[in-house]
Structure formats: structure tokens, C-alpha cells
């Protein structure tokens, strides 16, 4: 069963008022004159979309509580008895959020009889309110029974264990500790560790209490949890005296590393320097090296290099890390001799160290940027061969493989086959299969080429190389060739067989999860409804179905895109026919279609290319603002926008103009047209220039005599730009198949 059909199967059981045709029939195309965002289909949720409906009234009350707004919710419930239980649930949750524990418990009791599918929510909030009211421990524990037996598993179960532990802490702290340890994986953090530490302290197991308070302090640099843990540690230190277990050097080092990762450089340096009081050893020397390297993160490589050269670690791994730091400093200072000297020393004395791998890659990347193949190819080869299990070993191997292919060297085919066999699950395997196909075509082995392209067209249909493969399969000599058995065997031996449709028959858990989320949303508790679906996506094994439900409720197209990307990271692996059209429209939205098509037509551009670029730049968020201060749908810098606004006759330009979809589309398409003209009509070069700048593209084009655009794209040294070009072209292809005539 496909996702398209499985979603239809869910509907009758979940939502009797929604007809199946809404889900699986013909969806309306994007608005022909669509100058505004897409709106959610009215049959998606039972909650009235009017601000005067229950969901709207509850939302307003929770956002800004007042007696008048509470009265509005109560009045709605009185006038609509069929929704009174939902209103009671909402009022109970709102009262809990406001700290009105008696009212929360009272409202939740009223809601309980008619909300069995979400009894765990009622149980958790009621128990939590009664705990705050200091009710009898037995009564609090009894309230939690529906959470313990919830099917499917509940997103509030972790918080419920904390409520139970707090209820038990005073009278039976040891039982509270056992409870939390038994369900540790479910506990929300850092509250879980804080509560466990509290219970250990109540049980007079002070050393264990210190361990978990220290864990909270180490993992949380700021916030209430960190402050509570710090205060508790001070109290326990005073109480325990010499028996207080001091944090281990590795714990202190990890906290210092977190401070560095957070770019809190002064605090990080202080934390590293504080390890000078520990016994000589690896952690102490690592702290010295990392403190010395901090100026490197502040763009002062010379100062960092001077500090690192002054150190003389005795521990091999600390010395290896110091040498890597020196290589980094030399690269920043463009001192290739010193960089390679550090790499050479690492090879002589620390051949198996991860710091040598890092130095090899640092140096290789440095030379790759300048197209110095005689330097970077041996470095990548060493990284791939000497560190074959490294997380990015496939990338290092691919750099060598593609170089050999691009320059038509004799071992290119063997390296491409090796890429597939060694790293079949890596994304570069698709690149290798494509270029094996191109090699086969060059040798007029169209039978092998057909096999390679057919695999890409099936397994990578919505990816860049799948798109290219479909074009190759359209050639008569490839299409008519008999498939090569040896090529099939090569792919099969690497595990690259034809993809099987995903198991998407909706489970009972998925169906119930959607029903629960709709009840919560109908009560105006959209945050809980969203959390229910996200939890189910992680726990139930059918993230696509649940992500679709959540994306349908997104208030704007860009939010739906983000939901689906996050919850279904492999969404592009689905075939078009395995999901309803609406799923793809949410993933590849086309709001402002009329404006976009008009702007594209004005500048003689493919509207689907423009749409593909916008999806990659801003996901169709008209208010998008990048860290580089690029604005709007097409992410235009104000200085560039001002220049092209004049060309478009847009007067009184300001940065705010770029947040207007109509103006941004006119300016953005004008920029694209100008860049396309400057690049002799090459879409690939234009996209690379749009992302990385025109000067770089001119340099990259001089690196080789590219036989096809894909070779240029694969040669782009910046991963971000290379991925960007491929993604925009892939997006455009999907838009064309989805919305084209």
C-alpha cells in the first residue's frame, strides 16, 4: 500500500466528517493568480478556524490571560455542550500554567469522562496540580495510573515519572530513586537529573546527589537548572567537607569545551586554566593546549601559534592536538610550509591519532581551494586509506576518485567502483554511479550505462543525479540497450538494489496518535498537539504520516516545509506515487505563484528554476533575514537590491522593500537574469555565482575543460555551494513535475 492510499485508510476511522476525496482525490492546483500564501484545507482539523471558535478563544486566553477571556471560553462551552469537555480540558491546562492548582484539578476532573483517548494528559496535569497543592501522596500516585498504561506511549510519561518521584521523595526517597533510574531514558532533561539528584539527597546518598547535580552543571551553561545545580553543589560541599567528591578532570575539561563551543572565550580560558591544579596528565595538558588555541577562534592565529609553540606536552595525544593547532594557525596565516611541517611531524610520531587525520584534511582543503591537485590528492588519499572508518572517509575517497575521473586517468573506473563498494550508503555513491554511467557511455557500453542510470532514476528520483539520469535514459542508444548483468551484479554486491516501497500501512498507534493530536488541537492546545505528533514520529516508526498531519496545520508554507524536512529527513527518497499530491505541495509550496510567474516572464526565466532557488534560499518565507543581512524570498543584500531596484523602477528603496514579496521577486529575478547573461546562459554557473560570488565561479571554470555541467558542479570546492547548486536544480525539477503542464 502506498502512503497515498494509507492516508486515505486512516480517515474514516479518525475523522468522519472529512471525505476521502479530500485526501486522495485531485487537489486544487496552486492559485493561478496566487499573490498570497496557501491556506490550509478546511477539512484538515475539526477545530473552527475562526477566532471566535473554541480553539481561537483558548489560544487568546493562554497567550494573554484575563477574566474576560476566561469568561469567553466558559461562555462558549455553555453555548456548545458538545465541546464542553474540550473547553474544560483547555481551562484546566491554562489554570495549571497560571499556577492555579485547585482550579486546574477541578476543570480537569470535569473533562475526564469524555476524553478517554487522551486520559494520560488529564492524569498528568491533575497529578501535577495535586502535587503542587500538597495533596495526599497516595491520591497523587493514583491519578497517574492512565499514564503508566498509556497505549500508544505518551509524550507526558517522562514528566509523569518526575511527578511520581517528587510525590515519593519525602516518605520513600529510595523508591523514588529506583523509579527514576528504571525510566531514566524517558526523563526530560535537565529536570530528570535535577529530580534524581534531589531524591538521592533526600535518601542521604550524598555522593550520588553530587554526581547528578554536577552532571546538570556540566551540561547546562546557563539557566535555572544550572543555577539550581550550582547552589546545591555549594550546599553539599559545605555539608560534606572532605568527603565531597570533587569533579573529575575530564568533567571539568568537558565543561570548558562547552564554554568554548558557545564562544564564551573568557570563561572557557578560565575553565581550562583552572585545571592547572590537577595532577599532571592528559586532561591537564589538553586544557593547556586548548587554552593556548583560544585566540585562533578570535581570528588571532599569530597569537595562538605563539602560545602553542611555547608548550611542550609530554602526553602523545596532547602533543598531537598541539601540532594540529599549529597546522590550523599556519593555514589561517597562509603559511603552507609551516602547515605541512606540522602535518609531516604528525605523520612521523602520531600516525594513528585523530589529530593527524584532522591535520591531513585541513591541509587538503587548503590546497583544494587553490586547485593544487599535486598537494591535495595525496593528502585526501592518505586520509581515506589510513583512516578508513572515519565518519567522512567516503568524502576523502570521493575527492580522489572524482579527480581521477575528471582527468580521464586509467584508474578512474576502478576507484568509482571502489567508492560504491566501500561506501554504498553515503550520498557520494550516487555521484559515483552517475559517472560510471558516463564512462560506460564514452566506451559505448550502453548496456552498463542503462543499468546505472535506471538505478539512479529509481533510487534517487528526486535528487540531482536522478534528474540527470532520467535525461540520459532518454537517449535512444541507452534506452534501447539490453541491461548489463555485470553492472547489475556490481550494484547488487554493494547493496545498491532497486528500492522497495516503504512500509507505510498505518498502524493502530499512528491512527490513534493522529486522533489524539486532533482532540488536543480542537481544545486550542496546538502546542500539545504538535508535541504529540513529533513524539509519535520518533516513537511509532511512521514519521511521514505524522509529519504530514502536522504540516497541514502549519500557518505558513515555509513552516510546513521545515516540519517535513525535520521530521522526515529522507522525504526525497519517496517516489511521487507513494505520497498524496498534497504531501509534495507542502514540501514544495508555490505561494505567490502569480507574482513569481510574472517576474520570471518579465526576465525570460524558467519560473520553476526561480521557485527552486527561493525554496533553497528562504523556503518561501517573505520575512527571512540571514546572518549576512540578506532579505526576503530571494535573499537579496540591500546594496545589491538598491542597484537592481533602480533598474526595475522601484523608487524609495529601503531594506524593508525587500520584505515585500512583489518587490523582492522583481528584484531577485532581475539579479538572476543579469547573472545568467554574465555566465553565457549557464544555469549551473549562475547558481554557483548567486551563492558564492561571480569571481569565484570564473576561477573554478578555469580549473578544467569540463565535458558537461555536472563535472563543473562536482568540482566546486565549497560544499555549501556545490550542495546549493544541486539542490536548486533538483528543486526546479520537482516543481516542474509537480506544477508543470
Regions found by a protein language model. Give the residues of each.
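Structural register within alpha-helical repeat arrays
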Residues: 56, 91, 126, 164, ...
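Short solvent-exposed coil/turn linkers within tandem alpha-helical repeat scaffolds
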Residues: 44, 76-84, 108-120, 147-159, ...
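Catalytic glycan-binding domains that act on GlcNAc-containing polysaccharides
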Residues: 349, 354, 358-361, 370-375, ...
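Single-residue signature of alpha-solenoid repeat helices
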Residues: 69, 104, 140, 176, ...
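Residue-level detector of the short coil/turn that links helix A to helix B
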Residues: 64, 99, 134-135, 171-172, ...
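TPR repeat positional signature
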Residues: 53, 57, 88, 123, ...
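N-terminal leader/linker segments that initiate helical-solenoid repeat arrays
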Residues: 30-93, 97-99, 121, 228-230, ...
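Residue at a conserved register position within TPR or TPR-like alpha-solenoid repeats
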Residues: 60, 95, 130, 168, ...
Amino acid at each position: 500500500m502506498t502512503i497515498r492510499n494509507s492516508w486515505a485508510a486512516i480517515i474514516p476511522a479518525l475523522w468522519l466528517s472529512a471525505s476521502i476525496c479530500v485526501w486522495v482525490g485531485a487537489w486544487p492546483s496552486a492559485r493561478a493568480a496566487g499573490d498570497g500564501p496557501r491556506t490550509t484545507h478546511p477539512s484538515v482539523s475539526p477545530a473552527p478556524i475562526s477566532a471566535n471558535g473554541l480553539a481561537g478563544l483558548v489560544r487568546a486566553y493562554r497567550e494573554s490571560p484575563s477574566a474576560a477571556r476566561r469568561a469567553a471560553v466558559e461562555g462558549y462551552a455553555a453555548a456548545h455542550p458538545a465541546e464542553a469537555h474540550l473547553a474544560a480540558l483547555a481551562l484546566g491546562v491554562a489554570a495549571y500554567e497560571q499556577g492555579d492548582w485547585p482550579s486546574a484539578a477541578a476543570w480537569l476532573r470535569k473533562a475526564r469522562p469524555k476524553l478517554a483517548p487522551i486520559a494520560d494528559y488529564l492524569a498528568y496535569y491533575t497529578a501535577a496540580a495535586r502535587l503542587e497543592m500538597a495533596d495526599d501522596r497516595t491520591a497523587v500516585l493514583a491519578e497517574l495510573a492512565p499514564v503508566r498504561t498509556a497505549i500508544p506511549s505518551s509524550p507526558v510519561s517522562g514528566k509523569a515519572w518526575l511527578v511520581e518521584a517528587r510525590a515519593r521523595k519525602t516518605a520513600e526517597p529510595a523508591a523514588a530513586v529506583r523509579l527514576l533510574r528504571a525510566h531514566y531514558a524517558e526523563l526530560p532533561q535537565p529536570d530528570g537529573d535535577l529530580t534524581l539528584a534531589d531524591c538521592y539527597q533526600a535518601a542521604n546518598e550524598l555522593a550520588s546527589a553530587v554526581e547528578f547535580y554536577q552532571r546538570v552543571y556540566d551540561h547546562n551553561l546557563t539557566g535555572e537548572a544550572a543555577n539550581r545545580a550550582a547552589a546545591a553543589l555549594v550546599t553539599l560541599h559545605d555539608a560534606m567537607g572532605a568527603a565531597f567528591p570533587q569533579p573529575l578532570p575530564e568533567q571539568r575539561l568537558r565543561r570548558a569545551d562547552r564554554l568554548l563551543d558557545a564562544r564564551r572565550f573568557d570563561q572557557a580560558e578560565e575553565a581550562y586554566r583552572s585545571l592547572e591544579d590537577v595532577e599532571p596528565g592528559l586532561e591537564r595538558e589538553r586544557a593547556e593546549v586548548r587554552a593556548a588555541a583560544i585566540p585562533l577562534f578570535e581570528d588571532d592565529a599569530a597569537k595562538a601559534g605563539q602560545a602553542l609553540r611555547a608548550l611542550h606536552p609530554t602526553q602523545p595525544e596532547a602533543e598531537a592536538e598541539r601540532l594540529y593547532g599549529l597546522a590550523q594557525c599556519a593555514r589561517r596565516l597562509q603559511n603552507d610550509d609551516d602547515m605541512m611541517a606540522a602535518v609531516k611531524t604528525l605523520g612521523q610520531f602520531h600516525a594513528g591519532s585523530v589529530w593527524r587525520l584532522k591535520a591531513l584534511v585541513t591541509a587538503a582543503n587548503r590546497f583544494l581551494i587553490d586547485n593544487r591537485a599535486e598537494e591535495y590528492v595525496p593528502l585526501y588519499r592518505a586520509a581515506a586509506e589510513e583512516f578508513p572508518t572515519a565518519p567522512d572517509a567516503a568524502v576523502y575517497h570521493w575527492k580522489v576518485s572524482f579527480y581521477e575521473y575528471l582527468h580521464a586517468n586509467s584508474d578512474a573506473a576502478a576507484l568509482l567502483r571502489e567508492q560504491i563498494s566501500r561506501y554504498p550508503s553515503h550520498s557520494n555513491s550516487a555521484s559515483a554511479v552517475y559517472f560510471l554511467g558516463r564512462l560506460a557511455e564514452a566506451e559505448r557500453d550502453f548496456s552498463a550505462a542503462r543499468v546505472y542510470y535506471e538505478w539512479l532514476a529509481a533510487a534517487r528520483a528526486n535528487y540531482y543525479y536522478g534528474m540527470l539520469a532520467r535525461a540520459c535514459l532518454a537517449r535512444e542508444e541507452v534506452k534501447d540497450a539490453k541491461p548489463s548483468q555485470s553492472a547489475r551484479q556490481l550494484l547488487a554486491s554493494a547493496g545498491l538494489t532497486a528500492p522497495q516501497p516503504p512500509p507505510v500501512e498505518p498502524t493502530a498507534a499512528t491512527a490513534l496518535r493522529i486522533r489524539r493530536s486532533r482532540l488536543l488541537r480542537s481544545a486550542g492546545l496546538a502546542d500539545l498537539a504538535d508535541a504529540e505528533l513529533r513524539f509519535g514520529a520518533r516513537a511509532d516508526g511512521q514519521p511521514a504520516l505524522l509529519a504530514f498531519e502536522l504540516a497541514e496545520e502549519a500557518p505558513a508554507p515555509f513552516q510546513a516545509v521545515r516540519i517535513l524536512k525535520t521530521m522526515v529527513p529522507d522525504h526525497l527518497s519517496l517516489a511521487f506515487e507513494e505520497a498524496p499530491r498534497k504531501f509534495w505541495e507542502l514540501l514544495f509550496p508555490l505561494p505567490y505563484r502569480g507574482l513569481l510567474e510574472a517576474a520570471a516572464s518579465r526576465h525570460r526565466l524558467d519560473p520553476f528554476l526561480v521557485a527552486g532557488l527561493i525554496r533553497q534560499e528562504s523556503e518561501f518565507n517573505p520575512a527571512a533575514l540571514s546572518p549576512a543581512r540578506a532579505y526576503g524570498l530571494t535573499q537579496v543584500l540591500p546594496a545589491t537590491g538598491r542597484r537592481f531596484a533602480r533598474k526595475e523602477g522601484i523608487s524609495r528603496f529601503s531594506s524593508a522593500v525587500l520584505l515585500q514579496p512583489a518587490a523582492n521577486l522583481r528584484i531577485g529575478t532581475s539579479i538572476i537574469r543579469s547573472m545568467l547573461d554574465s555566465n553565457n546562459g549557464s544555469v549551473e554557473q549562475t547558481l554557483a555565482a548567486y551563492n558564492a560570488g561571480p569571481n569565484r565561479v570564473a576561477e573554478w571554470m578555469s580549473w578544467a575543460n569540463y565535458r558537461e555541467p555536472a563535472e563543473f558542479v562536482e568540482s566546486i570546492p565549497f560544499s555549501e555551494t556545490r550542495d546549493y547548486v544541486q539542490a536548486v536544480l533538483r528543486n526546479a525539477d520537482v516543481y516542474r513535475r509537480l506544477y508543470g503542464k
